[in-house]
A protein has these predicted regions:
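An N-terminal-biased, well-structured beta-alpha scaffold segment characteristic
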Residues: 1-96
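Alpha-helix capping/helix-boundary segments
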Residues: 9-11, 58-60, 102, 154, ...
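Generic structural signal for small/hydrophobic residues in well-ordered secondary structure
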Residues: 18, 52, 73, 88, ...
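Short gly/ser/thr-rich secondary-structure transition/capping motifs
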Residues: 30-37, 54-55, 126-134, 182-188
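Residues at secondary-structure transition points
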Residues: 36-40, 54, 97, 101-108, ...
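Phosphate-binding beta-alpha-beta segment of Rossmann-like dinucleotide-binding domains, i.e.
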Residues: 91-93, 98-145, 157-160, 164, ...
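Rossmann-like dinucleotide/phosphate-binding beta-alpha-beta segment
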Residues: 136-206
């Protein structure tokens, strides 16, 4: 089986592992193929693939119909909005993603932004560089309300980091689970209430 790699984030260790399992691995991840690449640019890159380890490039119905050898797209990430799911089903092409791999990193980035704004890091940094130790009122994160739109992998990871900072965490999702409220120290609310009550809002949805 020929595996064509288009994602830029692919290490030699992963390549060697796939080859040890009998896969032919072809690296085509330094061609500048990215989100929104037209079909006539992407097709020559993946036309001979049985499986694709994909980056952010777009897979439209017209392209997927032409990829007669393709059996699987493995998305290096958790988002799949650039891949037409109806066309995948029609062509019998499978789809996987790297769920459980990036959620923690995204949650850390979210908390970094919250703390940046809560502590006005930009102003404090400027003060220190100017040697002017101004007394500023910094609201901080404690006792602030964080609203999560979506409570899947990323939402739960953000909650796990925000609660220890003393933040009140509320969330809205289509299928709330009461067990999550107790497990993560959060509260399910309506979208209207979330927008009304939150000091910070995080969209953690596809």
């Amino acid at each position: 089986m020929k595996v064509v790699v288009t994602t830029k984030d692919f290490c030699e260790e992963a390549k060697h592992y796939l080859e040890s399992e009998g896969f032919e691995v072809v690296l085509r991840n330094r061609l500048g193929i990215g989100a929104g690449a037209p079909d006539d640019v992407l097709y020559p890159v993946v036309e001979d693939a049985n499986a694709i380890i994909a980056g952010t490039e777009t897979y439209r119905p017209e392209l997927l119909t032409r990829l007669s050898n393709l059996k699987l797209i493995s998305r290096n990430g958790i988002g799949y909005d650039a891949i037409n799911l109806d066309a995948l089903r029609k062509e019998g092409i499978g789809l996987t993603r790297t769920k459980g791999f990036v959620e923690g990193a995204v949650a850390e980035q979210v908390m970094a932004y919250i703390l940046y704004f809560a502590r006005r890091v930009d102003l404090q940094s400027a003060d220190m560089h100017d040697h002017s130790w101004n007394s500023r009122l910094m609201p901080g994160a404690k006792n602030r309300t964080l609203g999560l739109v979506g409570f899947g992998g990323i939402g739960t990871e953000v909650a796990k980091r925000a609660v220890p900072f003393g933040m009140k965490v509320i969330y809205f999702c289509r299928h709330p689970n009461p067990a999550d409220d107790a497990a993560y120290g959060v509260q399910s609310v309506s979208m209207e209430e979330l927008l009304k009550e939150s000091d910070y809002v995080v969209a953690a949805v596809p």
